[in-house]
């Protein structure tokens, strides 16, 4: 995800950022180092949130100037929405929702629900960074969850960039599942 961290850093200058499924805060750190005004980092694992805080400090950033929450991402997004808060950039990069091909229908429903919640807290004119690391979710189906979420909310969205895994993770044309990362 290093190329995606670079992109987030480039887009984040002057923005408020919310990052869910953040793990140790790679995207959060990229946004903060890129000049985000405030970054909220959410992951359900307290140990991951503590690591994210340490990563901010190790990179010369004051963790107290940002928000770190060990919480369920869906629950946190619902609370943010209920409070009427919005962010200029919202990042959602969950663990694989489709560990098997059989899980694809449930995974697509989960992505749609996640994307709808995320879109509800994106400020007008803001950015949603949505990622999937599941090899069982085709790119077109993943993009379809964004289209469905936007339609449910009667919001217009457009794609600025589509990224995949970097050159050091090549895939074979005959094995489309090898192109697992969509962002």
Model-identified regions with their sequence ranges:
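Mobile active-site "lid"/loop adjacent to the S-adenosyl-L-methionine
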Residues: 48, 87-117, 123
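C-terminal catalytic and target-recognition region of SAM-dependent MTase-like enzymes
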Residues: 86, 113, 127-183
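A short helix->loop->beta-strand "cap" motif at the edges of active sites that frequently abuts
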Residues: 36-37, 123-126
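Glycine-rich adenosyl-nucleotide cofactor-binding module
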Residues: 1-36
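S-adenosyl-L-methionine
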Residues: 47-91
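Conserved SAM-binding motif I beta-strand of class I
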Residues: 38-43
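Short helix-capping segments at alpha-helix termini
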Residues: 35, 57-63, 151-157
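A generic alpha-to-beta junction signature in SAM-dependent methyltransferases
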Residues: 12, 60, 84, 121-123
């Amino acid at each position: 995800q290093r190329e995606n961290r670079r992109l987030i850093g480039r887009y984040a200058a002057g923005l408020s950022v919310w990052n869910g499924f953040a793990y140790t805060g790679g995207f959060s750190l990229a946004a903060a180092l890129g000049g985000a005004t405030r970054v909220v980092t959410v992951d359900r694992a307290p140990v991951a949130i503590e690591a994210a805080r340490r990563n901010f400090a190790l990179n010369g950033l004051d963790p107290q100037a940002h928000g770190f929450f060990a919480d369920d991402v869906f629950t946190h997004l619902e609370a943010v929405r209920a409070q009427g808060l919005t962010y200029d950039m919202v990042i959602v990069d969950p663990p694989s929702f489709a560990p098997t091909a059989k899980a694809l229908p449930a995974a697509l429903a989960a992505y749609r629900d996640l994307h709808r919640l995320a879109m509800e807290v994106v400020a007008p004119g803001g950015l949603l960074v949505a990622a999937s690391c599941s090899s069982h979710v085709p790119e077109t189906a993943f993009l379809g969850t964004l289209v469905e979420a936007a339609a449910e909310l009667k919001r217009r969205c457009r794609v600025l960039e589509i990224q995949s895994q970097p050159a050091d993770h090549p895939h074979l044309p005959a094995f489309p599942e090898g192109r697992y990362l969509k962002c």
